[in-house]
Swiss-Prot record:
EC class (word): transferase
UniProt function note: Reversibly catalyzes the transfer of the carbamoyl group from carbamoyl phosphate (CP) to the N(epsilon) atom of ornithine (ORN) to produce L-citrulline.
Protein name per Swiss-Prot or TrEMBL: Ornithine carbamoyltransferase
Predominant location: cytoplasm
Gene symbol of the encoding locus: argF
GO BP of this protein: arginine biosynthetic process via ornithine; citrulline biosynthetic process; L-arginine biosynthetic process
Binding-site list for carbamoyl phosphate: S56, T57, R58, T59, Q83, R107, H134, P135, C136, Q137, C264, L265, R292
Record's subcellular location: Cytoplasm
Family note: Belongs to the aspartate/ornithine carbamoyltransferase superfamily. OTCase family.
Source organism: Nitrobacter hamburgensis (strain DSM 10229 / NCIMB 13809 / X14)
Pfam families tied to this protein: OTCace, OTCace_N
Length: 308
């Protein structure tokens, strides 16, 4: 009797003990790599299918290289090539790919398409990004925080900007890893009803507000993201609403003296963050970028039941 595949779709789907095991494996694999111990190939002979409906440099390279470092291989498929959901049904695509590959990563705007793919796949499916959430990114962020500042449990993270997929996964992480999350957004760009309802039901230590200074005060880390994503309309209007939410030296000064600055990149310098902050000593954005690969290696190994 075959067991159900171990998907990685959202942080709240995975028990805290399992998320911690993934991070521990990710840290160990990174350490071995830095020490030149590269003989371990736990995914030797395994193939990852990467499906991209939304373009990405970091997601593609980090999954591709990470899979190769684990001894496997990766193939890339684009939405244009696959006509995902427009030609063959998503369910049939999931069934067919499951016969060819060992694991699937999909980066697609529609979260419903992700869950439908996972429902019909007989191999693990990883959420590489949807409009609703970005769990791989926030696993890398938690890994990065703990590299620099130790356990994140009980610490305070401030989010300043708008409601988006990265914020949602930070909220899920606050619940799973037991840290405080202060959120500051313009009233017009506040967290959506689905996320607010989830926050309310989760009991997580999350404060929603509109004042970036209040959110940042005493924080251990300040996080932001680009104000206008691909496909967003009314970019100029959003930009005007978000100007007061820029992360600059003044805002960073309200956080703890050793507070970190995080951004998942690419950054629009001069908009959501100043050069002074993103290039400054508190910024760990390039560590985050590197840790995308290491965290995803941990996720790949976990999904496939392989030792990291």
């Amino acid at each position: 009797m075959s067991t159900a595949p171990r998907h990685f779709l959202d942080l709240f789907d995975v028990p805290t003990t399992e998320l911690r095991a993934i991070l521990d494996a990710s840290v160990a694999m990174k350490k071995r790599r830095k020490e030149g111990r590269i003989a371990d190939k736990p995914l030797d002979g395994k193939t990852l299918a990467m499906i991209f409906d939304k373009p990405s440099t970091r997601t593609r390279v980090s999954f591709d290289v990470g899979m190769r470092q684990l001894g496997g291989e990766a193939i890339m498929l684009t939405g244009a090539e696959m006509q995902l959901g427009r030609g063959e049904t998503i369910a049939d695509t999931a069934r067919v790919l499951s016969r060819f590959v060992d694991i699937i990563m999909i980066r697609i705007l529609s979260h419903d398409a992700l869950t439908e793919l996972a429902a019909h796949a007989t191999v693990p499916v990883i959420n590489g990004l949807t409009r609703r959430s970005h769990p791989c990114q926030v696993m890398a962020d938690v890994m990065t925080f703990e590299e620099h500042r130790g356990p994140i449990k009980g610490r305070t993270v401030a989010w300043t900007g708008d409601d988006n997929n990265v914020l949602a996964s930070w909220a899920h992480a606050a619940d799973r890893f037991s840290f405080n999350l202060n959120v500051a957004t313009p009233p017009e760009l506040a967290p959506n009803k689905l996320l607010k309802d989830w926050i309310r039901s989760s009991g997580a230590s999350i404060k929603l507000g509109t004042n970036p200074e209040a959110a940042a005060r005493g924080a251990d880390c300040i996080v932001t993201d680009t104000w206008v994503s691909m496909g967003d309309k009314d970019g100029e209007h959003r930009h005007n609403l978000l100007k007061p939410y820029q992360v600059n030296a003044k805002l960073m000064s309200l956080a703890k003296p050793d507070a970190l600055f995080m951004h998942c990149l690419p950054a629009h310098r001069g908009d959501e963050v100043t050069d002074e902050v993103i290039d400054g000593p508190q910024s760990v954005v390039f560590d985050e970028a590197e840790n995308r690969m290491h965290a995803q290696k941990g996720i790949l190994a976990w999904c496939l039941g392989a030792a990291g």
